[in-house]
UniProtKB/Swiss-Prot annotation:
SMART domains: GIYc
Occurrences of domain GIY-YIG (ranges): 14-93
Known role: The UvrABC repair system catalyzes the recognition and processing of DNA lesions. UvrC both incises the 5' and 3' sides of the lesion. The N-terminal half is responsible for the 3' incision and the C-terminal half is responsible for the 5' incision.
Alphabetical GO biological process terms: nucleotide-excision repair; SOS response
UVR domain sequence ranges: 204-239
Recorded name of the encoding gene: uvrC
Protein's UniProt keywords contain Endoplasmic reticulum: no
Signal peptide (residue range): none
Pfam family, any one: UvrC_RNaseH_dom
Protein name: UvrABC system protein C
Organism encoding this protein: Rubrobacter xylanophilus (strain DSM 9941 / JCM 11954 / NBRC 16129 / PRD-1)
Family according to the record: Belongs to the UvrC family.
């Protein structure tokens, strides 16, 4: 792009804030922060500016520059983190599949808090711990927590049943049962405080408390309580002893190590509490803008600690004190007390940081090696699939369609996309069937594929590019109907040659238009496994959407015309359970726990749900 065609920058202020680069369609390409917005943006467009190829590409694509003024660097830092999380700009380093990372939530906004795993939006009234790298690590942590602290597991802001009978969890030692007064509100609050202390890594203090309480209980001849406290201390000690002691002092801090290479980056966070490594989390980031490792870390830290527990000290490898100061100020506000963000020069803390840096590099190298091996295997599989199915080209983009309904009602369809043999979930689409009455799968399939291809012909970016293979969950009927659609829309060369095949469930046979018999792939072949995986994903996605619509309809039908349930009470019931599916699966005890719902009405709802 010649210099005179660069976007106008005359409106940019020489003050702190964030700048936003957009393309010709208004999409956010990059978000950055600066003490002087005008000067920082100008540096992108000077001949002596950043010469990285990706920055050159960014310059070529930017058509509009917006800004948001801030009252200082800390406010600019927060704005930048929020905008990156909201827009996920291509040229910013950002967590892969950010929505998929699980958290542990302690519902501190409730009178009797719950503790459970979540992937949903965060409620500012509650405390969140994470993100955790996997669901397995969350559930393992929750299991240890529940065995040790016996917090309640029943749903809703209020514990227990209206019947006053404690649940099974109480009888197996997994609930303190505040619902029946087995513990007071204050005692249950102490349980939750211990859960939070555990999640913050203050395990040694919890052990000391239990040992002291155990000795006191034994002295008072309360041997049953002393035995329970002994077991709790032993469980906590077991958790602690699995953690490697790394430093002589009892300091608590996080060490953030980052490694970046090309368009990928890895960040590893080593959590040290009371002198022990109590956790190590690894995150892979897309780094399309090819930022260096220090920039990746400084961008990642504010985003990560918006939801993660903030320690007293965060160690990073950047020596840029001016960049670290607003981060420290922001984290201090989040924690409520002073937080130090610095680069250690020597000693144990330096060694832990170097360990995090080394592991970040190893993590990225391992991921790349694994990705390369997967790509090689998938490439071979796709090539063999092309030969077996007589496709005109390598099926790099496979789209699969499935229909789901219940006796012709709430009829929906799914479109899932596999790119290079792997699911591209951001390109999944779902449809409500509009023109077909009843359970007519071939006609429904034809409608959906026609709508999808008409969007492609209209230039809709949400439905481009064209697939290399359309796969149908069905048999000859669906195949014939869709082949007719392709023939009609493809007349006059409007569509590229798009092959279509159908995978029948019963015999796992592949059908091709114009071929009387099926293509039979080897039962244990990678090619058939790939087609099955694509088909099963389309089936799952269609069923999930159908259940959602059916759940809404069933919820309305169960609650409509029910004596004692008006609009306000109906809204409270649905808010209590969160989703129609959770309501439809509710037990009588869970219905009785809905605030303000009489026991008689709860029993009537339960009877309607299970008749």
């Amino acid at each position: 792009m010649p210099e005179n065609s660069y976007p106008d920058r005359s409106h940019l202020p020489a003050s702190p804030g964030v700048y936003i680069f957009r393309d010709g369609e208004g999409r956010v390409l990059y978000v950055g922060k600066a003490r002087n917005i005008r000067s920082r943006v100008a540096s992108y467009f000077t001949r002596s500016g950043d010469g990285r190829p990706k920055i050159a590409e960014l310059r070529e694509r930017v058509r509009q520059i917006d800004f948001i003024a801030a009252r200082g660097e800390t406010e600019a830092l927060v704005l930048e983190a929020n905008l990156i999380k909201r827009h996920r700009p291509r040229f910013n380093a950002s967590l892969r599949d950010d929505k998929s990372y699980p958290y542990i939530v302690v519902t501190t906004g409730d009178e009797y808090p719950r503790v459970f795993a979540t992937r949903g939006p965060h409620d500012p009234r509650h405390r969140y711990f994470g993100p955790f790298p996997s669901a397995g690590s969350v559930h393992a942590t929750l299991d240890v927590l529940n065995k040790t602290f016996r917090f309640r597991k029943c749903r809703g802001p209020e514990p227990g049943r209206r019947s006053g009978i404690p649940c099974l969890n109480y009888h197996i030692g997994r609930s303190a049962a505040p619902c029946i007064g087995a513990v007071s509100k204050e005692e249950y609050g102490a349980i939750i405080a211990d859960v939070i202390a555990f999640l913050e890594g203050r395990v040694d203090g919890l052990i000391r408390e239990r040992e002291e309480q155990m000795r006191r209980a034994a002295a008072e001849m309360d041997f049953e309580r002393a035995a329970r406290l002994r077991d709790e201390a032993a469980a906590l000690r077991h958790v602690r002893d699995r953690q490697q002691a790394t430093i002589a002092s009892e300091d608590s801090f996080d060490a953030v190590g980052a490694y970046a290479e090309g368009e990928e980056a890895c960040v590893q966070i080593f959590a040290v509490r009371e002198g022990r490594i109590v956790g190590r989390d690894s995150f892979l980031l897309d780094n399309y803008g090819e930022q260096d490792a220090e920039s990746v870390a400084l961008s990642f830290v504010p985003q990560y600690y918006e939801t993660a527990a903030v320690p007293r000290e965060v160690l990073v490898s950047s020596p840029d004190e001016e960049a670290l100061a607003p981060i420290a100020e922001h984290l201090s506000r989040l924690r409520g007390t002073r937080v130090e963000v610095r680069r250690p020069q020597r000693g144990d803390k330096r060694r832990v940081l170097e360990l995090a840096l080394h592991n970040a590099r190893m993590g990225l190298e391992h991921e790349r090696a694994m990705s390369e091996a997967r790509r090689s295997r998938l490439s071979s599989t796709l090539d063999r699939l092309r030969e077996e199915l007589a496709l005109p080209r390598l099926p790099m983009r496979i789209e699969c369609y499935d229909i789901s309904n219940t006796m012709g009602t709430n009829s929906v369809a799914s479109m899932v996309v596999f790119q290079g043999g792997r699911p591209a979930k951001d390109q999944y689409r779902r449809f409500r069937i509009k023109t077909v009455e009843g359970a007519d799968d071939p006609a429904s399939m034809a409608e959906v594929v026609r709508r999808r291809l008409e969007r492609l012909l209209a230039g809709d970016e949400k439905f481009s590019p064209a697939p290399d293979l359309i796969l149908l969950d069905g048999g000859k009927g669906q195949l014939s109907a869709v082949a007719e659609v392709l023939e009609g829309l493809g007349s006059g060369g409007r569509l590229p040659d798009i092959p279509v095949r159908a995978l029948a469930k019963r015999e796992e046979e592949v059908f091709e238009p114009g071929r009387p018999g099926p293509v039979v792939l080897a039962p244990d072949s990678a090619e058939l496994r790939l087609l099955q995986r694509v088909r099963d994903e389309a089936h799952r996605f269609a069923n999930a959407y159908h259940r959602k619509l059916r759940g809404r309809a069933m919820t309305a039908s169960v609650l409509d015309d029910l004596p004692g349930v008006g609009p306000v009470r109906k809204r409270r019931i649905l808010e209590h359970f969160g989703t129609p599916q959770a309501f439809l699966e509710a037990s009588l005890e869970e219905l009785e726990a809905v605030p303000g719902l009489p026991g008689r009405v709860a029993r009537e709802i339960h009877a309607r749900l299970h008749r």
